[in-house]
Amino acid sequence: MGHDIKGFSCAFAVGLLFNILACIVSHSGYPIIVVASYFLAPFPNILCRNRDSFSSEKGTFEDIGLFLTGLFITSGFAIPMILAHSDIISGKALAFSMAGGVTVYATIITFLWFFNRHNDEDNNW
């Protein structure tokens, strides 16, 4: 399991490196704004998930959490597009920023899937 953590950490670092390269290519710090959305995206889901163990229904509060998570993920891709459209960053910086976003979000999703899978196997005794 230790090698898995190292692999996920390396993939996440590569995604952040792409965003740093986007800043270098564009000669501005604007693409680094996207990194804030990477860190803010999981918090609405964590804070708004269903705490009631007796009910399997999703509540309005959980739907709001899912909506806000989607908003942060969408903004992680939309902000570089808006910056490129307004000629604040170049097309190369847009490509680096998008590659970083895809890498980071894919790493987070794979990480959550991988470790939730192990938790499900442990609970089936």
From Swiss-Prot:
GO BP terms: late endosome to vacuole transport; late endosome to vacuole transport via multivesicular body sorting pathway; protein transport
Name of encoding gene: vps55
Organism of origin: Dictyostelium discoideum
Transmembrane residue ranges: 5-25, 28-48, 64-84, 95-115
Keyword DNA damage on entry: no
Recorded coiled-coil stretches: none
Membrane topology according to the record: Multi-pass membrane protein
Keyword terms, alphabetized: Endosome, Membrane, Protein transport, Transmembrane, Transmembrane helix, Transport
Disulfide topology: none
Any Pfam family: Vps55
Topology, Cytoplasmic side: 1-4, 49-63, 116-125
Name the UniProt record assigns to this protein: Vacuolar protein sorting-associated protein 55 homolog
Segments in the Lumenal topological domain: 26-27, 85-94
Function: Involved in endosomal protein transport.
Protein's cellular compartments: Endosome membrane
Recorded family membership: Belongs to the OB-RGRP/VPS55 family.
Gene Ontology, cellular component aspect: endosome; endosome membrane; late endosome
